[in-house]
UniProtKB/Swiss-Prot annotation, chains A, B:
Source organism of the structure: Oryza sativa subsp. japonica
InterPro entries reported in the protein's UniProt record: MeTrfase_7, MeTrfase_capping, SAM-dependent_MTases_sf
Cofactor(s) recorded in Swiss-Prot or TrEMBL: Mg(2+)
One record GO biological process: methylation
Protein name (database record): Indole-3-acetate O-methyltransferase 1
Cofactor binding description: Binds 1 Mg(2+) ion per subunit.
Keywords from the named record: Magnesium, Metal-binding, Methyltransferase, S-adenosyl-L-methionine, Transferase
List of residues binding S-adenosyl-L-methionine: G82, C83, N88, D120, T169, F170, Y171, T186, F187, S188
Residues reported to bind Mg(2+): N208, V212, R294, D295, F297, N298
Length: 404, 404
């Protein structure tokens, strides 16, 4: 089981803060198999598998509760928000289709037709996603059940659902009113819709001069990031509440943090707020990048605490919280030999690049971007042992249903 | 008003017969404006504009008749099949949304929410299409009407509908049952799902040895092409009948021919069955391409007669024919100076390349493909006057509704 960050860059990516490739973590773990054997990775892969199974269990629990509540329509619609280019999204959709079909079957009803929407920003590489889709299962009577009964192999060889791609931001409306039975969004909601304006405004007390992320920033900066996250999540919930069918459900997972302090971003802080920060400072001191250039760069990511997340859901009021937990996840660093400092350094640079490379290149160009990640690699290698020990993510995992 | 073929090649095109870029004609005329003044094009642009307006009128008539029949739901769904990378499709969708909104308004009802599906093969460049989409109009009460009232400029600046891309072949199922109000497909249905098998089988009496298109081919070849077209259209209609909502409608336009003889393909015949054919023969005689290589290449396009089209719709039986006409269209050749033989030759080669270039390159490679189109350009230049006079398309235009 690999710990890889699954973010991919499309060929035609239009660069903007909101268009950055998504951080993907659990989802990629969930659908990857094999690897180089137990203990070959930085963290214990068995512990990882446990976490992954636990989160998958949450999703299934969400679906089961929904099937208890809802009537059995002839059409079941699902939407995965922040689908990226695909394989993780396809795995989650397979879980949904299988579980819902089983629920229909256990009530002695014919399985519904499924329609699945894969949504992401217009800059996402939908072409790759669409070419990953297996061919549609011929809608012959009984064949859906046969396919599901045949297990995973068959389920990925054909596709027992109608598929569609939906370009747009999930911080606004994406679907007609009351049209979706189940929403999922895994590892996208920690991406803010934008860097908070005050944070880039040198006249503001929340100006994040000198720093490139909220981690270890001032109280005013931290408050601005928190406000942005909560405003974005509120807009997300307001749109979904309009789009969800009566009896529908939503499964959300995103980066989270265990600390109450917004300026202590945990794993995300270690990723963007320490050696990555120092690498920027290196470039400024070497005269490669001007100080103002660094000051105007900020990573639009925020790992919320459970409380911050819960407050937004409650204030919105449209959804009941069926489950809300902070789950300890793994490390984004993929290494075969955790004792090899050079390899750890490379893994750290690669992880950062996979997530923030597009943003960095758009801000200072590819050439200086490459220099930045070289500095990062060198610095991370010098702190390899500490990174191996301390680098891991927490995830907010949340199951919601429309409040009665 | 330009006569350009609007086919575009996506960057990640997976080549297969069915994945060839679509022939686009009317749709591009409909949404193009300006040009280099009256009479600057090969054909009289005013006559073209008349044809275009007439076909647009058919679409509006189809919509009006549908609005008479159907109840006013809160959600109106449209699907454009064979959307290619977009601008033509976006224009047609704008017409639909505007017309349907006006119909609701004239009955004193609130405009519905619109959901529009853009469908094409998985190899289509959906990324380009999605980046052409204007941003979603904020669903504020009254703003849809304001937008529509503001006319074309506003309608293209924002998007008063939810959009989704659907990858798949329209010769099979694409959507859930009874989920679409109106289908459109413009200039795609003349693409066969495949070259008829017999045509590529040297042991068959319908083997098309020596030729690369059905035009001027043997009776057996012509019959095989005709069978393939009719079988494909039947599969198209069967799927749409399942997917269309009660009271729904369908507007179809594709290449057609005025001759009763399937081996006389009219404009398509002139495009693929004369100088293009001779250019292949040149390469064979020069030893650049082996005879068998040419013999195994066939263009999977078929321009049906009205009667052939009508027979399939009647045999299927699910749809009533509200209108079925053969409309004289324009020429695919874009030239500023019709007297300039070299320019006419270039235009002919470009038109052929835009439609069949991907297929040719997949069959004999890019280098020899370029040689083929060079020969074509030279030959077409020698027959420039004849091409200017005789090259024009006919279009089958068809409006269908679910039979009661």
């Amino acid at each position: 089981m690999t710990m890889a960050m699954a973010s991919m860059k499309g060929e035609n990516v239009t660069v903007s803060a909101a268009a950055a490739p998504r951080m993907k973590k659990l989802a990629s773990m969930l659908c990857m198999k094999g690897g180089n054997g137990d203990g070959s990775y930085l963290n214990n892969s068995q512990a990882q598998a446990l976490h992954a199974r636990r989160m998958l269990h949450f999703l299934e629990e969400t679906l089961d509760a929904m099937m208890e509540r809802s009537s059995s329509d002839k059409l079941f619609t699902a939407a995965d928000l922040g689908c990226s280019c695909g394989s993780n999204s396809l795995f989650i959709v397979d879980v949904i289709v299988r579980r819902v079909s089983e629920a229909y079957e256990s009530r002695g009803r014919d399985a519904p037709e499924f329609q699945v929407f894969f949504s992401d920003l217009p800059s996402n590489d939908f072409n790759t996603l669409f070419q990953l889709l297996p061919p549609l299962l011929a809608p012959v009577a009984g064949s859906l059940e046969e396919c599901l009964a045949a297990g995973e192999g068959a389920a990925t060889a054909t596709r027992p659902y109608h598929a569609a791609g939906v370009p747009g931001t999930f911080y606004g409306r994406l679907f007609p009113g009351e049209s979706i039975d189940v929403f999922t969004s895994t590892f996208s909601l920690h991406w803010l819709s934008q860097v908070p304006e005050e944070v880039g405004d040198s006249a503001s007390p929340a100006y994040n001069g000198g720093r490139v992320f909220v981690h270890r920033a001032t109280e005013a900066v931290a408050a601005a990031y928190k406000r942005q996250f909560q405003a974005d999540l509120a807009r997300f919930l307001r749109s979904r509440a309009r789009e969800m069918k009566r009896g529908g459900a939503m499964f959300l997972a995103c980066l989270g943090r265990s600390s109450g302090d917004p300026a202590d971003q945990g794993g995300a802080g270690l990723l963007f707020g320490t050696h990555f920060q120092d690498a920027w400072d290196d470039l400024v001191q070497e005269g490669v990048v001007e100080g103002e250039k660094r000051d105007s760069f900020n990573i639009p990511v925020y790992a919320p605490s459970l409380q911050e997340f819960r407050d937004v859901v409650r204030a919105d009021g449209a959804f009941a919280i069926d489950r809300l937990e902070l789950v300890r996840g793994g490390s984004p660093l993929v290494v075969d030999r955790p004792d090899d400092a050079a390899e750890v350094g490379r893994a750290m640079a690669n992880s950062c690049k996979a997530v923030a490379g597009v943003l960095v290149d758009a801000h200072i160009g590819e050439r200086r971007g490459a220099q930045l990640f070289e500095r990062l690699e060198r610095r991370a290698a010098r702190h390899a042992r500490e990174l191996v020990e301390k680098m891991h993510f927490f995830h907010v995992v949340c199951s919601l249903s429309l409040a009665p």
